[in-house]
UniProtKB/Swiss-Prot annotation:
Site (Transition state stabilizer): K330
Catalyzed reactions per annotation: 2 (2R)-3-phosphoglycerate + 2 H(+) = D-ribulose 1,5-bisphosphate + CO2 + H2O; D-ribulose 1,5-bisphosphate + O2 = 2-phosphoglycolate + (2R)-3-phosphoglycerate + 2 H(+)
Oxidoreductase in keyword set: yes
Name of the protein in its database record: Ribulose bisphosphate carboxylase
EC number assigned by the record: 4.1.1.39
UniProt cofactor note: Binds 1 Mg(2+) ion per subunit.
Cofactor: Mg(2+)
Residues annotated to bind substrate: N112, K169, R289, H322, S369
SUPFAM superfamilies per the UniProt record, alphabetical: RuBisCo, C-terminal domain, RuBisCO, large subunit, small (N-terminal) domain
A Pfam family it matches: RuBisCO_large_N
Positions contributing to Mg(2+) binding: K192, D194, E195
Positions bearing N6-carboxylysine: K192
Length: 461
């Protein structure tokens, strides 16, 4: 059935839709399936299934219903682009407080339309949120400023937070795990649970929490510096998340503000993120995106992009989210992914298709991880243009030939090297831990700094 007369209006102007402030705008790359309708017909069916319509006319439709139709307002068939305007009245709101929910946004904009028989593929690349809808989202309650404050740094441009993930990701019992934390904290700032770590039979949750709390106290006493830990509280059950969070805060007591809560936001979903955001508003909310590549990967033509995921995370209230390594680590990505970091940290930023004003909503910190080490960092910082972020290097710290503490120091020295604009090989001559990173990661060293062996003369540990 051709629904383009109802669900498409190419006379609508994007500037007027934005000025009107009553529509969420979404940009998709879409391909119709052969043997069905043409591009505009398929786009209109997509808009219908995403809002008030179905594949047939129904007798219950009235004039009010037609007034909240989603409308295709722009198409570029040559580039497979379609843009759809969704009236904000379509989106579900909480009964308890009238707030918006990402679950509803996803259900409409990326729900049934992903399985339509006449669509070969469709993927969301950007979306725009008008002020009237933006203000209904929680946004972050804490930011990197709160971590900088705990670390005793300035809350403006407080700088690089040196972090790690304890490796191996699974298989350590509570005390060996805590010992690894202590070792890293002698040189670094921030440790996170790897996303599968929780309450395994060989590492009971409460035993691990107690051991890490003791390691933090000892590391702080030894170094005279504050330390940070991000605990995974992800669970299927809302009450389990609350129980984990409350036990952690009770155990860390005076160090409770040194604790972030990690939630696997993609696999556990918006409900888990919002549970943590609302139940623990004083804690830094660490959004881990494990599993996201199933839909965000450039190889996937359905779903949405990592840019869209990160933008949604800011709306939900994530204090920080993993944003990949922009092509400098082991995960998929490219240098242009820095647009993700800009969108979640700035008060106004341009996406692939839309300009977004955040109207003072707190920023979300880029958390960089995935195959990073000290040698890759100067180029990464060059690409991004600043170092006000958290980096969690697992292998990059514990793969250092001199251990976790030296690995942490090498990461910090890498940022110092970049800030000074120094040649990394020359800088390494006076910074032992950074120099030993060349020996720790020789394949990276050979690729990035081909002359390093002659200048640094590798030595046995």
């Amino acid at each position: 059935m051709d629904q383009s007369n109802r669900y498409a209006n190419l006379n609508l102007k994007e500037s007027e839709l934005i000025a009107g402030g009553r529509h969420v705008l979404c940009a998709y790359i879409m391909k119709p399936k052969a043997g069905f309708g043409n591009f505009i017909q398929t786009a209109a069916h997509f808009a219908a299934e995403s809002s008030t319509g179905t594949n047939v006319e129904v007798s219950t439709t009235d004039d009010f219903t037609r007034g909240v139709d989603a409308l295709v307002y722009e198409v570029d068939e040559a580039n497979s682009l379609m843009k759809i305007a969704y009236p904000i009245e379509l989106f579900d709101r909480n009964v308890i407080d009238g707030r918006a929910m990402i679950a509803s946004f996803l259900t409409l904009t990326i729900g049934n339309n992903q399985g339509m028989g006449d669509v070969e593929y469709a993927k969301m690349y950007d979306f725009y949120v008008p002020p009237a809808y933006l203000k209904l989202f929680d946004g972050p309650s804490t930011t990197i400023k709160d971590l900088w404050r705990v670390l005793g740094r300035p809350v403006i441009n407080g700088g690089f937070i040196v972090g790690t993930i304890i490796k191996p990701k699974l298989g350590l019992r509570p005390q060996p795990f805590a010992n690894a934390c202590y070792d890293f904290w002698l040189g670094g700032d921030f440790i996170k649970n790897d996303e599968p770590q929780g309450n395994q039979v060989f590492a009971p949750f409460k035993d691990t929490v107690r051991a890490v709390a003791d390691a933090m106290r000892r590391a702080q006493d030894k170094t005279g510096e504050a330390k940070l830990f991000s605990f995974n509280i992800t669970a299927d059950d809302h009450y389990e998340m609350l129980a984990r969070g409350e036990f952690i805060l009770e155990t860390f007591a005076d160090n409770a503000d040194h604790i972030a809560f990690l939630v696997d936001g993609y696999v556990a979903g918006p409900a888990a993120v919002t549970t943590a955001r609302r139940a623990f508003p004083k804690q830094y909310l660490h959004y881990h995106r494990a599993g996201h590549g199933a839909v965000t990967s450039p190889q996937s033509k359905r779903g949405y992009t990592a840019f869209v995921l990160s933008k949604m995370a800011r709306l939900q209230g994530a204090s920080g989210i993993h944003t990949g390594t922009m092509g400098f680590g082991k995960m998929e990505g490219e240098a242009a992914d820095r647009a993700i970091a800009y969108m979640i940290t700035e008060d106004a930023a341009d996406g692939p298709y839309f300009h977004q004003e955040w109207l003072g909503m707190n920023p979300t910190t880029p958390i960089i991880s995935g195959g990073m080490n000290a040698l890759r960092m100067p180029g990464f910082f060059d690409n991004l243009g600043h170092s006000n972020l958290i980096m969690t290097a697992g292998g990059g710290a514990f793969g250092h030939v001199d251990g976790g503490a030296a690995g942490a120091k090498s990461l910090r020295q890498a940022e110092q090297c970049w800030k000074q604009g120094a040649d990394p090989v020359e800088f390494a001559k006076d910074h032992r831990e950074f120099a030993r990173a060349f020996e720790s990661f020789p394949q990276d060293a050979d690729k990035l700094y081909p002359n390093w062996r002659a200048k640094l003369k590798p030595q046995a540990a």
